[in-house]
């Protein structure tokens, strides 16, 4: 079970966007895409046949998983994730600081 999943609220712990929070929109092997953060400018060539207008656009660039931490909204801080098996035998993720289950 992965510790960071799609739609998790994460906080960036290093780099130019440090202390910024956002939702995970894509999880790769060792990288994540965070909505609205770690933006890079991409030069796009116009293509009238495809209906693409040219110019400079901003896209989200993947961040290393080691540079983000899951955001605990109860404590308003970055937190660590643990994995345990509940009474029904189903694995669940929880915050290590206050033992709350991550929904």
UniProtKB/Swiss-Prot annotation:
Keywords: Ribonucleoprotein, Ribosomal protein, RNA-binding, rRNA-binding
GO biological process: translation
One cellular component (GO) term of this entry: ribosome
UniProt GO MF annotations: rRNA binding; structural constituent of ribosome
Keyword field contains Ribonucleoprotein: yes
CDD domains reported in the protein's UniProt record: KOW_RPL26
Transmembrane segments: none
InterPro entries cross-referenced by the UniProt entry: KOW, Rib_uL2_dom2, Ribosomal_uL24, Ribosomal_uL24_KOW, Translation_prot_SH3-like_sf
Its job: One of two assembly initiator proteins, it binds directly to the 5'-end of the 23S rRNA, where it nucleates assembly of the 50S subunit.
PANTHER family according to UniProt: MITOCHONDRIAL RIBOSOMAL PROTEIN L24 (PTHR12903)
Subunit structure and binding partners: Part of the 50S ribosomal subunit.
Membership in a protein family: Belongs to the universal ribosomal protein uL24 family.
Protein name in UniProt: Large ribosomal subunit protein uL24
Organism: Ruthia magnifica subsp. Calyptogena magnifica
Gene: rplX
